[in-house]
């Protein structure tokens, strides 16, 4: 009976540990142990996507390579006639407010009612916020 109890206790103690290692393996780029099962030969055949560089050189090369005869928006790389015509990068979740003098800002809709971002900007400009 003590062997059965020992086996059950060991199973209960090691299962959470194995689950934790699977979590860390997936968090830090592993395939949940699948890479070891597939072998190294298969790993070389499959090309993994790489993250975008963390420095600004990728963005700068995109900016410099963009074709635009008017104004190139720095945030979206859209070509527009005037800087305040630049679209928001995330139009589905951002509203744009023009401040005058060719300046426009984008802000999160944040679940407010339509036009609420513009009202808050106006209140802030008047010093009421």
Curated annotation (Swiss-Prot):
Stretch list, region Disordered: 32-51
Oxidoreductase listed as a keyword: no
Protein's UniProt keywords contain Signal: yes
Keywords annotated in UniProt: Signal
Residues of the signal peptide: 1-19
One Gene Ontology term from the biological process aspect of the record: ERAD pathway
UniProt cross-references to InterPro entries, sorted A to Z: LCL2
Coiled coil feature spans: none
Role summary: Probable component of the endoplasmic reticulum-associated degradation (ERAD) pathway.
Similarity-based family: Belongs to the LCL2 family.
Matching PANTHER family: LONG CHRONOLOGICAL LIFESPAN PROTEIN 2
Protein name: Long chronological lifespan protein 2
Organism: Pyrenophora teres f. teres (strain 0-1) (Barley net blotch fungus)
Gene: lcl2
């Amino acid at each position: 009976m003590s062997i059965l109890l020992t086996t059950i206790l060991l199973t209960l103690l090691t299962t959470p540990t194995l689950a934790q290692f699977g979590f860390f393996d997936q968090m830090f780029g592993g395939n949940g142990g699948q890479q070891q099962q597939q072998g190294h030969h298969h790993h070389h055949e499959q090309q993994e996507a790489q993250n975008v560089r963390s420095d600004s050189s990728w963005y700068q090369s995109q900016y410099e390579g963009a074709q635009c005869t008017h104004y190139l928006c720095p945030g979206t790389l859209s070509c527009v006639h005037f800087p305040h015509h630049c679209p928001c990068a995330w139009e589905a979740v951002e509203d744009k407010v023009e401040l005058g003098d060719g300046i426009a800002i984008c802000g999160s809709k944040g679940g407010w009612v339509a036009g609420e971002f513009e009202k808050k900007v106006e209140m802030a400009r008047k010093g009421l916020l």
